[in-house]
Amino acid sequence: MYQPGILVRRKRVWKPWTVALITVALLLALAVLIGLLVYFLVYDEKTHYYQASFWIPSINYSSDLSKEQSKFRTGLKQKISNEIDVIFQRSSLKHHYVKSQVVNFRPSNDGVKADVLIKFQIPRKNAGTLKRQADNILQEKLQSSQSILKRDASLPYLREMNAAQAEHILNSDCGSGMEYPPIARIADGKPADKASWPWQSSLQVEGIHLCGASLIGSQWLVTSAHCFDNYKNPKLWTVSFGRTLSSPLTTRKVESIIVHENYASHKHDDDIAVVKLSSPVLFSENLHRVCLPDATFQVLPKSKVFVTGWGALKANGPFPNSLQEVEIEIISNDVCNQVNVYGGAISSGMICAGFLTGKLDACEGDSGGPLVISDNRNKWYLLGIVSWGIDCGKENKPGIYTRVTHYRDWIKSKTSI
């Protein structure tokens, strides 16, 4: 029988190069630890939000300042933001200043008052000091005769605000999506970038995507009426927000569904509905509303527009997990009503968009989703709602969309938006 071996312990002798290697490794680890400690003590920055109120004696309050898309309001907001940008970008806080945004105008006995939200990135240990610096910088610069802004003495100057509430306010303006993006597609296409289309939502039954929709207020969506042909009970529906279906930013239950009174499932007219969420969403960079155009808003044939959704990538094709986008063109109703296209089926409440050559188009599952256009300020407006078509990307069969301007008064009557 074999006997087990005898364990003999030997004294380990470290070679010089091994000792040197271990020493270097320990010194490197110590250096990294010290570096991290210094970073978190000195450079670790936190976002801080401050609300400031200003008095503008040179401007009289007008009702246009309460109208979201009025030129007077948008122009004055931009002028104020530009002045605050210049003040901080030319100051000792230029590396900490992020942005400012006017959130409200108020009437005053002798002018206008403006509430502004200002965003900074500040090292944690210096927050109090830099807040005082910001206060002093504003006071000094606003004393200049060149400034249209004066301090509103009736309120504390810089009031700190909760981050979530501040982001909600900063993103409360409608239609701020990405910069005009490059060509992409739904059919045959490319996924949309994160935060490209923050108003896009998914209408789902039992967790399955059925239709798209557009966020037009913190508690309201607009979509196609035909999405509810088979499932009319609001309790069956949930709404998902975010670029991917599998990992949404947030979800909401549906409180109510209002379908246009004249809609009938056997025809395409009046294919519009609004959906009220069970509770409001909190706006953020990745989740906020699209602008609704005035009823008089005009768009010309050949104008570039975008349609987005989680519909099929091609006729009878697979459905994506990530939001898709496609750039197409407006086609006049006269062209779309030609015999070889839709032969007179396009009414004044519809928009025709795509290409007569086919290929680029919305598809099954995109119903209810947005057709949007950008203005020269990079504000995105909801022109249409994916409604119907023949196949996907078929020659002489572009997509047909519910014309939002035609139903603008109806939307307002149901949502007060």
Swiss-Prot record:
The keyword Cytoplasm does not apply. It comes from the Eukaryota. Its main location: membrane. Residues 186-416 form the Peptidase S1 domain. Disulfide bonds join 211-227, 336-352, 363-392. GO terms for biological process: proteolysis. Glycans are attached at residue 60. Pfam families: SEA, Trypsin. Residues 43-417 are extracellular. GO terms for molecular function: serine-type endopeptidase activity. GO terms for cellular component: extracellular region; plasma membrane. Keywords: Disulfide bond, Glycoprotein, Hydrolase, Membrane, Protease, Serine protease, Signal-anchor, Transmembrane, Transmembrane helix, Zymogen. It is found in: Membrane. The active site is at residues 226, 271, 367. Residues 1-21 are cytoplasmic. The keyword Transmembrane applies. Belongs to the peptidase S1 family. This is Transmembrane protease serine 11G. The gene is Tmprss11g.
